[in-house]
């Protein structure tokens, strides 16, 4: 039953014969409305464990989540993220600053995905439809990274 709804690459994460939990990811966006749509659209293959709505909060909390030692974040979880996804409302500078703050010898390497608003047709209004379009591009790239092993590399991918 689950082999038809979950891609083969995601099935590799299940060792118990039960449906696999989604691969944990973090989403950074400017609105919860779009963030919630992205979260829903990425399921079941990917589980959004955190949704950050401001670059300042993301910059202070993501580094601890990637270290997974001595975390003091207000949104702590036991699932270490495999990717950080930044929406179109985050700037290139935001990405660079958050990524720089997240570097270190004890930091888990993750894929960084940055939404390029220019890749979304201007005819799509900001709202749920925009969120679905962004989620599709995001999911396609995440699927590709899982297939080719890039999900564990500290690299930036523009989507």
Curated annotation (Swiss-Prot):
It comes from the Eukaryota. Disruption phenotype: Enhances the tolerance to cell wall, oxidative and heat stress but not osmotic stress. Leads to reduced production of kojic acid, together with the reduced expression of kojA, kojR and kojT. Also leads to the increase in mycelium growth and conidial formation. Negatively regulates mycelium growth and conidial formation and is required for stress tolerance. Plays a role in kojic acid synthesis in coordination with kojA, kojR and kojT where it acts upstream of kojA. This is Kojic acid related protein 6.
């Amino acid at each position: 039953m689950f082999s038809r709804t979950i891609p083969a690459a995601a099935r590799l994460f299940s060792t118990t014969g039960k449906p696999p939990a989604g691969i944990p990811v973090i989403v950074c966006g400017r609105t919860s409305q779009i963030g919630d749509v992205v979260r829903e659209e990425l399921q079941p293959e990917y589980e959004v464990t955190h949704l950050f709505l401001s670059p300042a909060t993301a910059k202070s909390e993501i580094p601890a989540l990637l270290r997974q030692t001595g975390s003091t974040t207000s949104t702590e979880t036991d699932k270490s993220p495999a990717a950080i996804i930044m929406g179109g409302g985050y700037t290139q500078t935001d990405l660079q600053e958050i990524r720089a703050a997240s570097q270190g010898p004890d930091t888990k390497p993750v894929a960084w995905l940055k939404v390029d608003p220019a890749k979304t047709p201007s005819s799509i209004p900001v709202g749920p439809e925009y969120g679905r379009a962004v989620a599709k591009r995001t999911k396609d790239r995440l699927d590709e990274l899982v297939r080719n092993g890039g999900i564990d590399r500290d690299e930036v991918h523009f989507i």
